Amino acid sequence: MSEIRLGLVVTEFNREITYAMEELAVQHAKDLGAKVVERVLVPGSFEVPLAVRKLLERDDIDAVVTLGAIIKGDTDHDQAIAQQAFRKIQDLMVEYGKPVALGISGPGMTRMEALERVHYAKRAVEAAVKMVRRLRELEGE
């Protein structure tokens, strides 16, 4: 079975959190025998789907991992952003037939809760790698 090639889409909003997630994801991909071939930084979670689409269009990307932290503010804006972004990410995964792992934590979190969930980046990488392997098995590779 050939090496699994991942693309990362990482939000710049709450960068101190997403930077830690990004570094953890890259290392965990290596530990699992996968390789991150492209990293794309986007301003926030709302912009994630467009970058996901661009990576899914590439032949050298087997799966995409999204990383971000949607923290609760004074309004319900975090809920609206998350709902729209998550739905579009799922739609893109089905449209392109390639795994897209959701490593965006939130909404409704405090900054402290987001920091406590940095390790969720590893779960997202694991999900992407597992799905690529399962799809390859289904396709007889």
Curated annotation (Swiss-Prot):
Q: Which InterPro entries match?
A: LS, LS/RS, LS/RS_sf
Annotated keywords: Riboflavin biosynthesis, Transferase
Q: Which residues bind 5-amino-6-(D-ribitylamino)uracil?
A: 13, 45-47, 69-71, 102
Q: What is the lineage of its organism?
A: Archaea, Methanobacteriati, Methanobacteriota, Methanomada group, Methanopyri
Q: What is this protein called?
A: 6,7-dimethyl-8-ribityllumazine synthase
Which protein family is named in the record? Belongs to the DMRL synthase family.
Gene3D superfamilies given in the database record: Lumazine/riboflavin synthase
Q: Name one GO molecular function term.
A: 6,7-dimethyl-8-ribityllumazine synthase activity
- State the reactions this protein catalyses: (2S)-2-hydroxy-3-oxobutyl phosphate + 5-amino-6-(D-ribitylamino)uracil = 6,7-dimethyl-8-(1-D-ribityl)lumazine + phosphate + 2 H2O + H(+)
Name the PANTHER family on file: 6,7-DIMETHYL-8-RIBITYLLUMAZINE SYNTHASE, 6,7-DIMETHYL-8-RIBITYLLUMAZINE SYNTHASE DMRL SYNTHASE LUMAZINE SYNTHASE
**Example GO biological process:** riboflavin biosynthetic process
Its annotated function is as follows:
Catalyzes the formation of 6,7-dimethyl-8-ribityllumazine by condensation of 5-amino-6-(D-ribitylamino)uracil with 3,4-dihydroxy-2-butanone 4-phosphate. This is the penultimate step in the biosynthesis of riboflavin.
List the pathway annotation. Answer: Cofactor biosynthesis; riboflavin biosynthesis; riboflavin from 2-hydroxy-3-oxobutyl phosphate and 5-amino-6-(D-ribitylamino)uracil: step 1/2
Q: Which domain of life is it from?
A: Archaea
Q: Which residues form the active site?
A: 77 (proton donor)
What GO CC terms are in its UniProt record?
riboflavin synthase complex
Q: Which NCBIfam families match?
A: lumazine-synth
Keyword check for Transferase: yes
Q: Which Pfam families match?
A: DMRL_synthase
Where along this sequence does the record place binding of (2S)-2-hydroxy-3-oxobutyl phosphate? 74-75, 117
Name the Enzyme Commission number(s) assigned to this protein. Answer: 2.5.1.78
